[in-house]
């Protein structure tokens, strides 16, 4: 059975959802530490201190605060990302004058991934806003920035809607876009470049699970090294906006540099780098294998 664009899009969307699920289940505790250290750099002396204090204050469940919105965020983001990635690859082929079935270069794949990420950011921003607020709720309450309240996904969603309406879910959209668009150029570029290295003349589709995971991990490292300061600014905007203060990208950046120094923009980098390999490796492994399985089932029909 010959694939059509709608079926191909559905396969990419489903495979992206599988990849997003694998990414969260693998890396959620490190993501929680990252957001805490980004938002409250003066509160923790480092990753170990953040882990120990989180465990003593909230228990093991503290590492998995925000998992539900993180799952929704990653499933939504990666579903849209990989579905749009397929469409954007076709757009790149058209722009450079290639046949629909022609293989793209690593640079062209990176450009397609960058374009696709702009669409993914629109579904990611609301769910990531809820996730970041849940992850830092304990620190916001104990520091006196907000009053003690229910700490659930639904309570956070209701509070955002009550205070700011539907547009309130898009606090930090500009910084999310500024992170996603260049970041995913390096993400897909690093992934495809690494796959080309491991394939060394063979088809990339023949790579086993270990090279795929290493390639995904390398792509994740490339992404975070390129845009980490922007992610730090985004976390600040999304978390601190629950106090009622609305600060934009430039003002938040200038405030951090002026009051805390440039190094504050890299708070939480260590857990992010530790998380990058297993989480993004699992993402691409789940994506590639589930996509391959669905494509083989389709061709057998």
From Swiss-Prot:
| Matching Pfam families | Mito_carr
Q: Which InterPro entries match?
A: Mitochondrial_Carrier (IPR050567), Mitochondrial_sb/sol_carrier (IPR018108), Mt_carrier_dom_sf (IPR023395)
User: Where is it made, tissue-wise?
Assistant: Expressed in the liver (at protein level).
Molecular function in Gene Ontology: antiporter activity; L-arginine transmembrane transporter activity; L-lysine transmembrane transporter activity; L-ornithine transmembrane transporter activity
Positions of transmembrane segments:
5-25, 68-88, 110-130, 168-188, 207-227, 237-257
One GO cellular component, as annotated? mitochondrial inner membrane
Protein name per Swiss-Prot or TrEMBL: Mitochondrial ornithine transporter 1
What is the organism of origin for this protein?
Rattus norvegicus
């Amino acid at each position: 059975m010959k694939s059509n664009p709608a079926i191909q899009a559905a396969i990419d969307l489903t495979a992206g959802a599988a990849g997003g699920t694998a990414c969260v289940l693998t890396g959620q505790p490190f993501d929680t530490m990252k957001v805490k250290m980004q938002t409250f750099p003066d509160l923790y002396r480092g990753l170990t201190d953040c882990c120990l204090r989180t465990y003593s204050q909230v228990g093991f469940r503290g590492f998995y605060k925000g998992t539900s919105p993180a799952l929704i965020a990653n499933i939504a983001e990666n579903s849209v990302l990989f579905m749009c990635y397929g469409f954007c690859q076709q757009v790149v082929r058209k722009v450079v004058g290639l046949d629909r079935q022609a293989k793209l270069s690593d640079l062209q794949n990176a450009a397609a991934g960058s374009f696709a990420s702009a669409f993914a950011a629109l579904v990611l921003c609301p769910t990531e806003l809820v996730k970041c607020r849940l992850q830092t709720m304990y620190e916001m309450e104990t520091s006196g920035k907000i009053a003690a309240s229910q700490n659930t996904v639904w309570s956070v969603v209701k509070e955002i809607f009550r205070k700011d309406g539907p547009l309130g879910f898009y606090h930090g959209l500009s910084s999310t876009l500024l992170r996603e668009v260049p970041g995913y150029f390096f993400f897909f570029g690093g992934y495809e470049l690494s796959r080309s290295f491991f394939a060394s003349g063979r088809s990339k589709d023949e790579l086993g699970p270990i090279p795929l995971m290493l390639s995904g991990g390398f792509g994740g490292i490339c992404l975070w090294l390129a845009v980490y300061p922007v992610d730090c600014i985004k976390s600040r905007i999304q978390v601190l906006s629950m106090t009622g203060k609305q600060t934009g990208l430039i003002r938040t950046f200038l405030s951090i540099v002026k009051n805390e120094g440039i190094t504050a923009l890299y708070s939480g980098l260590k857990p992010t780098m530790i998380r990058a390999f297993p989480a993004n490796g699992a993402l691409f492994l789940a994506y590639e294998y589930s996509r391959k399985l669905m494509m083989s089932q389709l061709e057998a029909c």
